[in-house]
């Protein structure tokens, strides 16, 4: 049961402040904003709004170009830095994404969203030590947030630090006991540790929480193949 926590988190953090639209409506909106931006070339707001729509259409290069325009005039614009880094990630230009996240942290130290994104990006780049250091920093600075523990747990699990990962998933659950994803990650970790009985108990808990058994079928199979 594979999950892409990097993409899921980044998509969740994007606030476009627009209603759900069809692709045609989005393209029409972009055309309108492009004309307005041509008429008001100094308007940062118009360029950021257009770039946000470009991201929704997965037009990474167009979005990046708009953020470049903003950052040429305002090098420390937090929105442009964060979402240009996101666009760079989608374009697989990881070093450039990393540089933008790091610059943003210089200007907004300890920013939660940026720490999460940078920790996960480093893990994606196989910079495991740096990823774990950032995850530790994330937990130390945001120990009230369940996602901080879940991010660190994911990094620990990938490195085979299963007992630490299990502890962190339990911490995440203690801070947000309605998030079924955290329970599922915990189950996967228990299976990795060959603690099948405990994994089955957690699966039973998930079904009681309303998760359809069909969605958990693969995990049940893994427990039974012990």
Locate each region found by the language model:
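N-terminal leader/linker segments that initiate helical-solenoid repeat arrays
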Residues: 17-61, 65
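Helix-start (N-cap) detector for alpha-helical repeat units in TPR-like alpha-solenoids
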Residues: 44-45, 78-79, 112-113, 146-147, ...
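Terminal, low-structured helical/coil segments at or just beyond the last alpha-helical repeat
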Residues: 24-28, 188, 192-226
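Register position in tetratricopeptide repeats
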Residues: 56, 90-91, 124-125, 158-159, ...
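Structural marker of alpha-solenoid helical repeat scaffolds
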Residues: 39, 73-74, 107-108, 141, ...
């Amino acid at each position: 049961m594979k999950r892409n926590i990097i993409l899921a988190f980044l998509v969740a953090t994007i606030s476009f402040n627009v209603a759900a639209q069809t692709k045609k409506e989005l393209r029409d909106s972009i055309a309108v904003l492009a004309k307005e931006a041509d008429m008001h070339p100094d308007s940062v707001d118009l360029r950021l709004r257009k770039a946000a729509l470009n991201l929704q259409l997965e037009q990474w290069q167009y979005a990046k170009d708009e953020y470049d325009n903003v950052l040429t005039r305002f090098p420390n614009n937090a929105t442009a830095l964060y979402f240009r880094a996101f666009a760079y990630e989608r374009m697989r230009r990881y070093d450039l994404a990393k540089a933008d996240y790091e610059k943003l942290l210089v200007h907004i130290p300890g920013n939660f969203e940026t720490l999460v994104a940078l920790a996960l990006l480093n893990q994606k780049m196989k910079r495991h030590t740096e990823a774990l250091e950032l995850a530790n920093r994330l937990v130390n600075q945001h120990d009230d947030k369940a996602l901080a523990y879940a991010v660190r747990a994911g990094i620990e699990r990938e490195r085979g630090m299963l007992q630490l990962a299990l502890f962190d998933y339990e911490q995440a659950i203690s801070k947000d006991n309605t998030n079924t994803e955290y329970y599922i990650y915990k189950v996967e970790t228990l299976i990795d540790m060959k603690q099948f009985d405990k994994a089955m108990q957690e699966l039973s808990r998930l079904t009681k929480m309303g998760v359809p058994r069909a969605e958990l079928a693969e995990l049940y199979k893994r427990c039974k193949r012990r």
